[in-house]
């Protein structure tokens, strides 16, 4: 059976030139005369590519499929994963000609170090990673390693990594400014006993902002509860036991706020006439705007952050000029307060 080298020898060209011709890459590289001579040699020798060569040619014509690992903590925040996927899909829709696989990699909080795909991505065919929901311990781990694939952090910050985030303390402080501007003097806080960095930053920003604006938050008006509607119900019931109640309640999640609104309604508290309620908005806005009354929130743009992360991944994997000299990309998105009937 004639080989590629036999064809090359008969045509008076190199084996590489014959390979280019067979793979349809002769245009601009091989003269018309040489192409004719190669074709004549192929016919004269009755050359047939080997099965392996045919398979290689077939594979070369298949577009490369990139695989992106999304690391998401396996805890109550899993309910927010749909917003992240919506953002990733929005990014992918901008580049429909580039195929991607997205793999969800759940990990236990504080145990990101167990995810071998970050340090040995070739074992899992990962081309890039998006990392979300990291704890302080997880951040320390990330600070100690140097992944050899593009990595972007979602709502977390390390200077050596690319990230798309918001200023969580600024977000909390903006709500404090709104309270002070409306003339409120005392506030209660319903919050989770949270190990989550972003949640703690938002609450810290809110409390610090209140203090700087002269809005009092008495110690007895700080209620720790579960991050759920049941947690909000319990916090509201404890709040109603106070002899002197603040005029406004801040909740560090809309799940807590929705439970609180229900408990206040059951107790005959008129919102916002008797009490105003504001919250951080984590879930879909359709949830908070359909509460009774509709809830005032400062929305965490989770979908937009996820879209920005995926935009970065696509660029890092497909933009050859960037891939040749990559620098961390740091993006900070703005947040907005949506004032609804729960606050006046």
Report each predicted region and the residues it spans.
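N-terminal helix-turn-helix DNA-binding module of bacterial transcription factors
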Residues: 1-57
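Short beta-strand segments enriched in small/hydrophobic residues
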Residues: 15-19, 57-77, 178, 186-193
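Alpha-helical recognition/docking segments in bacterial nutrient-uptake
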Residues: 62-177, 181, 240-241, 294-299
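Periplasmic-binding protein-like
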Residues: 69, 123-133, 188-191, 243-256, ...
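Hinge/beta->alpha junction and helix N-cap segments in small-molecule ligand-binding domains
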Residues: 73-83, 103-113, 164-174, 190-237, ...
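Short acidic capping loops at alpha-helix termini that bridge into adjacent secondary structure
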Residues: 186, 217-221, 271-277
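Flexible loop/turn connectors
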Residues: 237-344
């Amino acid at each position: 059976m004639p080989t590629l080298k036999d064809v090359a020898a008969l045509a008076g060209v190199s084996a590489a030139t014959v390979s280019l011709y067979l793979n349809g890459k002769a245009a601009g590289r091989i003269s018309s005369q040489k192409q004719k001579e190669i074709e004549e040699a192929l016919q004269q020798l009755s050359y047939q590519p080997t099965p392996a060569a045919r398979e290689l040619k077939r594979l070369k014509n298949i577009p490369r499929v990139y695989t992106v690992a999304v690391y998401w903590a396996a805890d109550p925040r899993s309910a927010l994963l749909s917003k992240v996927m919506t953002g990733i899909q929005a990014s992918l829709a901008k580049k429909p000609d580039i195929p991607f696989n997205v793999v969800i990699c759940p990990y236990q909080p504080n145990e990101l170090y167990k995810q071998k795909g970050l340090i040995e991505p070739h074992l899992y065919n990962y081309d890039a990673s998006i990392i979300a929901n990291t704890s302080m311990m997880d951040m320390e781990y990330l600070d100690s390693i140097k992944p050899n694939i593009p990595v972007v952090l979602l709502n977390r910050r390390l200077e050596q990594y690319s990230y798309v985030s918001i200023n969580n303390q600024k977000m909390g402080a903006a709500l404090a400014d709104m309270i002070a501007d409306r003339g409120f003097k005392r506030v209660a806080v319903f919050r989770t006993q949270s190990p989550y960095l972003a949640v703690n930053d938002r609450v810290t920003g809110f409390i610090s902002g209140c203090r700087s604006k002269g809005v009092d938050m008495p110690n007895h008006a700080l209620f720790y509860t579960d991050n759920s509607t049941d947690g909000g119900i319990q916090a509201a019931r404890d709040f109603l036991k106070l002899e002197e109640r603040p005029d406004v309640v801040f909740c560090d999640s809309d799940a807590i706020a929705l439970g609180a609104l229900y408990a206040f309604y059951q107790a005959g508290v008129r919102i916002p006439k008797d009490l105003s309620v504001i919250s951080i908005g984590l879930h879909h806005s359709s949830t908070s705007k359909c509460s009774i009354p509709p809830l005032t929130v400062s929305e965490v743009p989770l979908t937009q952050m996820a879209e920005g992360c995926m935009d970065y991944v696509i660029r890092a994997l497909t933009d050859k000029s960037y891939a040749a000299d990559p620098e961390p990309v740091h993006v900070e998105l703005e947040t907005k307060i949506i004032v609804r009937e729960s606050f006046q």
